A protein has these predicted regions:
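Extracellular beta-strand/beta-solenoid scaffold signature
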Residues: 3, 7-8, 43-50, 206-212, ...
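Active-site proximal loops enriched in glycine and acidic residues that flank catalytic Cys/His/Asp
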Residues: 193, 273, 296, 320, ...
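An acidic- and aromatic-residue-enriched active-site/binding cleft used to recognize and process polar
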Residues: 11, 25-27, 37, 125-127, ...
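Extracellular beta-strand solenoid repeats
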Residues: 7, 21-23, 31-33, 214, ...
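Right-handed parallel beta-helix
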Residues: 219-230, 275-289, 298-313, 326-345, ...
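Extracellular beta-rich repeat passengers
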Residues: 234, 444-532
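Extracellular polysaccharide-degrading/modifying enzymes targeting complex plant/algal/animal polysaccharides
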Residues: 1-273, 278, 324-325, 529, ...
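The right-handed parallel beta-helix/beta-solenoid scaffold, focusing on the short coil/turn
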Residues: 4, 18-20, 28, 61, ...
Length: 544
């Protein structure tokens, strides 16, 4: 187990045309793990098992039992119509059933509002009032002055949009195998095993370390065939989701209408200011935060042929949230190709598989993204705010990706897209992607195929196959999202797209199809990380 990250600096770089490669010896395997083994399991009532966790563990949010994630026990969705929300907390402890919990101060309430996700810990219950830990609760409410007035309608307790809520980590909810509860006083975990799990012989790992590897200013470096596993994310300020896995942290701070003051999730691998750094054939699995972050002036670097699976937050983050970085801090010329993203956002469901902020000449090509709670690929930032005009953004290419089963209705995260964009991006192209099942099963919650949101401008959308989308196959709703063009795409969708921006055009798109033509089938078959030809779901199948 690593308790501190392995750090590569400029001194660890390749020289004189050579590259330094870190990989397993032939026939070997290297796993970088941030977890410790939990032993001493003893039986308890109702088929549960209990163990004391090692002292190094802070708050365990995940266990891995023989390699399978175990999450905190959770309640059903809670009816909250009679709850009153204010600065002191939320009423309804009795009606929600929370007042009956034996250890309410270990319980978190999780709120889902449109594209935002919130996790705030209960501190105490007084009569019918539930109080929460700070700064999480204050940051979750409207009127913080830190997210801009237009975002208050997606704060906890909004009366404008519907929202959902459940409780997690209550022993009273531990009824489903594969889940557990943490008792902070006794420092024990109580687990309900799955069928066939023998807790006297099972390997149980709990995450401790937040980061495994940091590449800080290194160049000409290759990480090949490594496995990154079992990281934690302590998030001491709670979790107040802003967008795409970014959070609002701290008790105070500057106004962030353009999103330039939000906090990126902690990642197993962080590359800062890297040049020609390659991550190839690696696994990012069983993680409590994000998979990897490339930021702070990382250029000409690549993530390829790697797997991101069972990750609590987002899979991969490229770029930053400063619209006008210095030349040294600007991210440019990076490539994300032939990777597989499966089941990211396992805990923080507002996160995305691939996020790119302010970046230029980024290629996101031939990746497979599947089974995701919210958007698949998100590129751009800034909305329509004055400070986000003329940003470091453009020349990006999103091509040949296979994106299936995203914006899953059961997760109750809304207003996104399989491919989502923000901001003016001259020269950006979205082409030859296969999108199938994006918030499929409802037309009520703004689940799009390709979503050119807010000030998305100067983007070409061409040659894509978009099927089984809950709302629009392509959306450019804002009049200030200008000069976009959607041409030569195929879809079964019949909901009229909103291309409202000045100079935006739609032409030669095949809509309302009952059968994909051969050319569209070929595009869909060749999308993704392989093998090829990939499966293409025939139109007319409207099952789950």
């Amino acid at each position: 187990m690593r308790t501190t990250p392995l750090v590569f600096t400029e001194l660890d770089s390749g020289r004189n045309g050579y590259t330094v490669t870190w990989t397993a010896e032939p026939g070997g395997r290297v796993e970088l793990s941030g977890g410790v083994v939990v032993t001493g399991w003893r039986p308890a009532e109702h088929g549960r098992w209990v163990a004391t966790v090692p002292d190094a563990v802070l708050t365990p949010r995940q266990l891995y039992v023989n390699g399978l994630r175990a999450s905190w026990a959770r309640s059903d969705w809670l009816e909250h119509e009679d709850c009153k929300i204010g600065p002191e907390g939320m009423t309804g402890a009795g009606a929600l059933g929370v007042a009956a919990y034996g250890r309410p101060s270990d319980v978190e309430l999780v709120f889902r509002v449109r594209w935002r996700d919130y996790h705030c810990r209960i501190t105490d219950i007084s009569d019918d009032l539930i109080r929460f830990a700070e700064p999480c609760w204050t940051n979750a409410l409207p009127g913080t002055g830190r997210v801009g007035p237009h975002w208050d309608n997606t704060a906890v307790g909004t009366e404008i949009h519907s929202w959902s809520m459940f409780a997690s980590n209550a022993l009273e909810s531990l009824t489903e195998p594969g889940h557990f509860v943490w008792n902070s006083d006794a420092r024990t975990v109580t687990y309900l095993p799955r069928d066939g799990e023998d807790m006297e012989s099972a390997e149980v790992i709990v995450p401790v370390a937040e980061q495994l590897v940091v590449v800080d200013g290194a160049h000409d470096l290759v990480l090949k065939g490594l496995s990154f596993a079992h990281t934690a994310w302590h998030r001491s300020d709670g979790y107040v989701g802003a967008q795409a896995g970014f959070t609002l942290t701290g008790a105070s701070g500057p106004l962030g209408e353009a999103g330039s003051h939000y906090t990126k999730p902690v990642a197993a691998l962080t590359v800062r200011g890297g040049r020609r750094v390659t991550v190839s054939g690696c696994e990012f699995v069983r993680l409590g935060g994000a998979g990897a972050v490339f930021e702070a002036g990382t250029k000409d670097s690549t993530v390829t042929a790697s797997t991101f699976a069972d990750v609590s937050s987002g899979g991969l983050y490229v770029g930053g949230i400063d619209p006008h970085p210095t030349a040294e801090a600007a991210d440019e010329g990076n490539t994300v190709s032939f990777n597989t993203f499966h089941g990211t956002g396992a805990e923080y469901t507002d996160s995305v598989a691939i996020w790119a902020g302010y970046t230029r000449n980024l290629t996101i090509e031939r990746n497979t993204l599947e089974h995701l709670p919210y958007s698949g690929i998100s590129i751009g930032w800034g909305w329509n705010q004055p400070e986000a005009q003329d940003p470091w953004l453009g020349g990006n290419r999103i091509a040949g990706n296979r994106i299936t089963d995203v914006l899953r209705v059961a997760e109750r995260q809304y207003d996104g897209g399989a491919i989502y964009t923000q901001g003016p991006q001259p020269g950006t192209v979205i082409e030859a992607n296969y999108i199938n099942r994006s918030e499929y099963g409802t037309t009520a919650n703004d689940g799009n195929g390709i979503y050119l949101d807010e000030q998305s401008s100067h983007i070409l959308v061409t040659g894509n196959v978009v099927t089984r989308v809950g709302y629009k196959w392509v959306s450019n709703w804002a009049e200030y999202g200008v000069e976009n063009r959607a041409a030569g795409n195929w879809t079964d969708n019949t909901i009229t797209p909103a291309f409202s921006g000045a100079g935006s055009v739609m032409e030669d798109n095949a809509e309302g199809l009952s059968e994909l033509p051969p050319e569209a089938v070929r595009v869909a078959e060749q999308a993704g990380a392989g093998p090829w030809p990939g499966p293409v779901e025939a139109l007319g199948n409207h099952g789950p």
